[in-house]
Amino acid sequence: GAQLLALMGDRVPRAMLSGLPLQQQWSYRSTGDFAPDYYLETDADLYYYSFTDAHIAMTYRALTPQQQARLDPMITGFNPADMYAADHVRRVLTTFPGVFTGLGEFSVHKEFVSPKIAGDPPSLTDPALDRLLDFAGEVGLVTVLHNDIVMPFTPPENERAYLDELKAELAEHPN
């Protein structure tokens, strides 16, 4: 928090503060004593790291009210393919009242990241995402969603593979 504010200086009046939602698994069978800190350094899975939300909240609470006024903390430690995602967000809001402004940035279709995530990959057509977005709309959470429009190595006829799904999802959840 304080480091970000120092970096912002006087030129940036306000910024979004998000934790990293995915953690690279350190698989000894894959990398031995080398602890990977980037998703391309190993073939091991990525997993959703829910502690990131508590870390952001505690960091934010340690700031002065003037410093807090310049930051918008966001919830990111949920799996958008999990029907429990909305419940996780509700629990974070209850545990840290008044801290969080919204959700995100979280990814649904993200080129080389999505295939590395353990479990079901997020999808724009997943009811879990609908449930999450419905809850965000009900409680007034700003939502920042990252969704690639194209797939890697897409043939020209499928160039914008996810665009129609994205438009439909946004139309279904206008709030």
What are these regions (language model features)?
Residues I117-N175:
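Catalytic pocket-lining loop regions of alpha/beta-barrel enzymes
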Residues G1-R131, F135:
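Mid-domain alpha/beta scaffold segments of enzyme catalytic cores
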